[in-house]
Amino acid sequence: VKLGVYLTAWSLAAGCSTQRLEAVRPFDKAVDAGSSGHFQMEGLNRGVVAVRVDGGVYVGWRMFGYEYDPVTPGNISFNLYRDGRMIASVSDSTNYLDTEGTSASSYSVRAVIAGVEQEDSGNASTWAQKYLRIPLDIPPAGVTPGSPTCDPPSEGFTYDVNDGSVGDLDGDGEYEIVLKWDPQNARDNNQSGCTGNVLLDAYKLNGKKLWRIDLGVNIRAGAHYTQFLVYDFDGDGNAEVVVKTAPGTRDGTGTALHTGPAAVDDQSVDYRSVANLPDTTGFVLTGPEYLTVFAGPTGAELATANFDPPRGDPNAWGDTNAAWMDLYLATAGFVSDLGAGKTASGRPSILMARGNPDRSTIAAWNWRDGQLSEIWKFEAASATPYAGQGACSMAMADVDGDGAQEIIHGSATIESDGTGRCTTGFGYGDALHVGDLIPSRPGLEVFMPHTASSGPIYDVHDASTCEVVASGPVLSTTARRGVADDVSPLYDGAEAWTTNSGGVISATTGALVDSTANPSMNFLVYWDADESRELEDGTSVTKYDGTLLQECAECASNNGSKATPVLTADLFGDWREEVIWRETGNAALRIYTTTDITTRRLFTLMHDPQYRMQVSAEQTGFNQPPHPSFHIGLGMADPPKPDIRVK
């Protein structure tokens, strides 16, 4: 099924300049589909989206990273077809306003590379709505066990949509959505009590449900417990789903876990605690812990291994009530995976983190040739300079350009081989932004607000060396939230702000540039016609100056006061991002996309390895928006061609 058949969105700006009906040779060969690059990325379709708007039909599509050519950009253009007839050749963008289009029109796109027309994208029907609606199968309500296992006992619960991620589960070039269902009695790590089971669903964009995984009674529900990854880790063209599991987990076919250690463990035991530590009723403090790989098309178990890092002594994580033991993070990443030294194949690995803020650990795993194997482990114990330097999220970035990504874990950068690289020593934090925040400066930067009252409330530092570029004052109040990106054309590079920064600062200089602004401190999204990024908060998208661009009054946000979306990412259409919100009542997801015409032409952000890996981690911990490896903003340079390959 072609992606564009199901897509829809809203509002329109001005038209886009094009060359009409440029003569080309007929299709005689396909472009080299990126078979020789370094980083293994997804083989996507054109992602054509057609939307009825005032003045015609908006059409958007992908340019792939491997066909993007910054040296000779005129080498590629796109022929746009309506109802099988070519209507335009577009050379300066990847979107178009068809003023003669109607709600009955269908569209397809063919790239033209070096004068040769490539294969057809397949037809995309025109949609009238402002969004794509995906109906959901709401799980049935449940009741927790009685005393003494659960306190409060026999607690009823229903389910809410929570965080989501995407991957091409069935190899058709279209993203599927993997969605977490949380029971309404989900708990924070410092709250006792039993919870309902956590569920993972997979949906195609046409609303077809592929499968449901039930993580079982021994996986507690809450924002810090279940961090799942969706990516093609073995390069077979189908994405896998990887998540922490336990006895009681049932895969997408309804079968109990039965490979690796799960084959010999009793899968029927309920390990929930009866408060053998203070305030830990309902916690899972004993019993097996697994890491499981599930097949994308079916949700069937492919492999299960013992989870590493293991819990060990619940009191060995820096607290006395087992809360920090069960702080988890996860991301896909292109790390050093070929043995000793910083050698990287360019194939993705699985990274699972446990602990924080006192003791944190990260383990890297490979899923290759039907084998799940651990390749390295990093531990920041209390006696090391990396202790207490993490965050409630982590981000992947190749900070030294060697073809392997490092892990930015709060104030620390961890080498791609699992050794420490550098740290600012400024301590723990809840938010984290990693990208080219200062385009006039070589390399990548990190912006982070801090929760330690002994250090600066925020800092901007070099991602490779941890050299501090700018920092805030030391205050008695800590900064819990913060955002950094190029959201205004008035200042060079990224702007940044926190809950107590006193306004908006320049990431480049550290100077306060706007003391009156009060922008939201949540998510970011590339939305309208310009290069500045917009703000996403709750169920709305706004400009930096507060101008409302999109909202969904019928939708709800996730994670309480965090008010986060299900997901933001470049899911289809041109390089700009989509936002997934859940409808109030959880009956459906809505995927909103922009229909503002832009003349900025970029390849799909999902073919930027840094952005794609950060999307994989977006749903973990304290959700953070993804950042590309290059600067997007007023006066930006064309980014380099990504060194990627696809199946």
Q: What is the role of each PLM region?
A:
Residues 2-14:
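Bacterial N-terminal signal peptides
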Residues 34-43, 68, 91, 97-647:
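Beta-propeller-forming repeat regions
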Residues 50, 59-60, 109:
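Long terminal accessory regions outside catalytic cores
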Residues 51-55, 90, 344:
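Short, ordered beta-strand-loop transition motifs
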Residues 60-104:
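Recognizes extended acidic, P/S/T-rich segments that occur
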